[in-house]
């Protein structure tokens, strides 16, 4: 079957791409590589290749996956996507049960099966893994690209420590299926997947294919030390924080925001696009 690979040329794992593709060759044959070097390249390549290939291998992190998800046609009409995690966070890959390493993931993909996944409609953009606003986004904003590349997932811990000295709060109002959470908040997270910031399971019950989004609100009054302890010990947040679930959410806040780790104005509404694309996942 015709297959191509869109690959983030700036990935710290670039030299491992040939080894990963060699492991996929028995299933997909020869896989030509299309490097994506500049912002927007992966999205453009995905749109151009969508009608030419049956399988699109994506080598990169959540930002590359984000671009590909925005370049492909909706409704499962595009190619089957195979993820080779090669970024800092690799959170969508984690949500699928793939190891955050391109060669190890390629081994898993050899026997993986297609799975219909949801996307989140955030207005002009779609999110593959989720939306994080407030403290979670600020932790990423303090990181430079070289720091992320050098430290890998540990960069998010460094960012969290730097942003968390005196974290600001913002007024926020979130509504899902008639349920409303309103007040000063540290963060609002809207998840398709549950992992954020390189394997921190902020919404562990989220399912990327259930047709629902999951919302976590971190109120301003919660103990910062308690949050830090939970994230350091369990890589999760306390279970008693406000959580909502439904097919759509309305979010009113001025928090800084990121979609799949990429800067973006906080969307006023987020709606699930059920079964919007097909991705290989471990059986």
Which residue ranges define each predicted feature?
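Gly/Ser/Thr-rich active-site loops/lids in small-molecule metabolic enzymes
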Residues: 145-155, 196-225
């Amino acid at each position: 079957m015709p297959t191509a690979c869109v690959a983030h040329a700036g990935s710290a794992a670039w030299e491992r791409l040939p080894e990963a593709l060699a492991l996929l060759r028995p299933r997909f044959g020869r896989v030509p590589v299309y490097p994506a070097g500049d912002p927007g390249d992966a999205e453009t390549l995905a749109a151009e290749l969508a009608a030419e290939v049956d399988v699109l291998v994506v080598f990169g992190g959540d930002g590359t996956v984000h671009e590909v998800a925005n370049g492909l046609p909706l409704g499962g009409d595009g190619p089957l996507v195979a993820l080779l995690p090669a970024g800092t966070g690799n959170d969508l890959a984690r949500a699928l049960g793939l190891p955050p390493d391109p060669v190890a993931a390629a081994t898993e993909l050899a026997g993986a099966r297609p799975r219909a996944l949801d996307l989140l409609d955030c207005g002009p953009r779609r999110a593959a893994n989720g939306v994080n606003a407030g403290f979670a986004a600020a932790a990423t904003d303090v990181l430079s690209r070289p720091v992320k590349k050098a430290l890998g997932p540990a960069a998010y811990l460094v960012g969290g420590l730097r942003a968390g000295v005196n974290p600001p709060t913002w007024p926020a109002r979130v509504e899902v299926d008639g349920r409303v959470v309103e007040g000063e908040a540290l963060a609002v997270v809207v998840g398709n997947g549950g992992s954020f910031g390189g394997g921190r399971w902020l919404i562990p019950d989220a399912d990327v294919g259930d047709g629902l989004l999951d919302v976590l609100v971190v109120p301003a009054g919660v103990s910062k030390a308690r949050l830090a302890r939970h994230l350091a010990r369990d890589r999760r947040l306390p279970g008693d924080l406000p959580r909502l679930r439904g097919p759509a959410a309305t979010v009113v806040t001025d928090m800084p925001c990121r979609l799949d780790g990429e800067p973006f104005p906080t969307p006023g509404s987020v709606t699930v696009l059920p079964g919007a694309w097909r991705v290989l996942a471990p059986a």
